[in-house]
């Protein structure tokens, strides 16, 4: 499944747009990866949204990734889970999920990226690229140059994340992101 980790990677944000409507729109527009991210949603709401999003991503032969919640990813038969630095460690997530799920990890520094790759992460989300309103605690933007630095030390796909908008997406791609 790792070979399918390319193309536009979209992260949903229910406070900005309905996740089901936005998933449909981005898939029609060519996105190949969609991440269900809804920090304040209940488990039941995540499962409801996740099952519907899973149906849509299958129709478009796209991947569905669940943010933070390995239990939800397994329950809805998602394609992967995306873990932050304070979430479940990659080796434990891999022991629980086996090879059923892709495991992505957020990395801000080269060292975090190197560690995630050595622990068995399938891909990295590097950022924040720019200031983001959807994750106020994201930290200081690292910019697209960080992607190049990280790609020099890891052999897994790297995506830019955080604050990416149509007007700055090209900078992220030029930085070496698999897509964003």
Give residue spans per PLM region.
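Phosphate-binding beta-alpha-beta segment of Rossmann-like dinucleotide-binding domains, i.e.
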Residues: 131-140
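Conserved N-terminal beta1-alpha1 strand-loop-helix module at the mouth
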Residues: 1-90, 94-122, 139, 149, ...
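Glycine-rich beta-strand-to-loop/alpha-helix junction loops that act as flexible
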Residues: 126, 159-164, 180
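Conserved cofactor-binding/catalytic machinery of classical short-chain dehydrogenase/reductase
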Residues: 146
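Short glycine-rich anion-binding loops that position phosphate/pyrophosphate groups of nucleotides
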Residues: 87, 129-131
């Amino acid at each position: 499944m790792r070979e399918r980790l390319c193309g536009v990677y979209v992260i949903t944000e229910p406070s900005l747009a309905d996740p089901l409507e936005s998933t449909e729109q981005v898939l029609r527009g060519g996105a190949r990866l969609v991440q269900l991210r809804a920090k304040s949603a209940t488990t039941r709401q995540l499962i409801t949204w996740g099952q519907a999003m899973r149906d849509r991503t299958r129709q478009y032969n796209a991947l569905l990734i669940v943010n933070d919640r390995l239990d939800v990813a397994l329950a809805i038969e998602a394609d992967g889970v995306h873990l932050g630095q304070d979430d479940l460690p990659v080796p434990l997530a891999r022991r629980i999920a086996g090879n059923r799920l892709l495991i992505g990890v957020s990395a801000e520094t080269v060292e975090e990226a190197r560690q995630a790759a050595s622990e068995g992460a399938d891909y990295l989300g590097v950022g924040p690229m720019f200031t983001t309103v959807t994750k106020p605690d994201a930290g200081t933007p690292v910019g697209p140059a960080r992607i190049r630095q990280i790609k020099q030390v890891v052999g897994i796909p790297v995506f830019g994340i955080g604050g990416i908008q149509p007007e700055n997406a090209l900078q992220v791609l030029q930085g070496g992101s698999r897509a964003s």
